[in-house]
């Protein structure tokens, strides 16, 4: 019996050795009003709250809008066009001097890019496309002319 008691005492606590701790009830401390600090944000526009007054930074309005005109000759130039979109620049792409297969691949690549960036791609002419990032809004449509012509 001595050996089995040693195993029991080793693996299990005897009733005499069990300890219970009583938790002391704490009174909740009064909460202090915390002020929010301005945190840097990767977005171009962000709101800063100061003492219940809402202030919106117009930092993005200071940047001038830029548009890039491109006429790629090979598919490898599509990545450069995507880099312009990542820099919040609109890109007009003229695909008239490239083969149909290469033009289709470039349009597919740019479509994926503008989708990932939340932008838009629109056909504005025969093999001419306008790619815009999410901070640019395009108004109007020239679809009536496009429907009359035969495109890619």
Curated annotation (Swiss-Prot):
Single GO cellular component term: cytoplasm
Keywords linked to the UniProt accession: Cell cycle, Cell division, Cytoplasm, Septation
Keyword presence, Cell cycle: yes
Subcellular location as annotated: Cytoplasm
UniProt record, GO biological process: division septum assembly; FtsZ-dependent cytokinesis
Primary location recorded for the protein, binned into one broad class: cytoplasm
Matches recorded under Pfam families: SepF (PF04472)
Domain of life of the organism encoding this protein: Bacteria
UniProt keyword annotation of Nucleus present: no
InterPro entries from the UniProt entry: Cell_div_SepF, Cell_div_SepF/SepF-rel, SepF-like_sf
PANTHER family for this protein: CELL DIVISION PROTEIN SEPF
Record's subunit section: Homodimer. Interacts with FtsZ.
Function: Cell division protein that is part of the divisome complex and is recruited early to the Z-ring. Probably stimulates Z-ring formation, perhaps through the cross-linking of FtsZ protofilaments. Its function overlaps with FtsA.
HAMAP family the record matches: SepF
Family per similarity comment: Belongs to the SepF family.
Protein name, entry field: Cell division protein SepF
Species this chain originates from: Listeria monocytogenes serovar 1/2a (strain ATCC BAA-679 / EGD-e)
Taxonomic path: Bacteria, Bacillati, Bacillota, Bacilli, Bacillales
């Amino acid at each position: 019996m001595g050996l089995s008691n040693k195993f029991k005492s080793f693996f299990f606590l005897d009733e005499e050795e069990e300890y219970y701790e009583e938790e002391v009830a704490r009174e909740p401390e009064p909460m202090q009003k915390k002020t929010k600090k301005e945190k840097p944000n990767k977005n171009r526009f962000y709101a800063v709250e100061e003492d219940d007054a809402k202030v919106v930074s117009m930092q993005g309005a200071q940047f001038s809008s830029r548009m890039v005109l491109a006429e790629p000759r090979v598919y490898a130039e599509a990545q450069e066009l995507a880099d312009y979109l990542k820099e919040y620049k609109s890109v007009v792409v003229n695909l008239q001097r490239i083969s149909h297969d290469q033009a289709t691949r470039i349009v597919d690549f740019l479509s994926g890019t503008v989708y990932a960036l939340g932008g838009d791609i629109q056909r504005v002419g025969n093999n001419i496309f306008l790619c815009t990032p999410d901070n640019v809004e395009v108004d109007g449509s020239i679809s009536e002319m496009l429907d009359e012509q035969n495109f890619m």
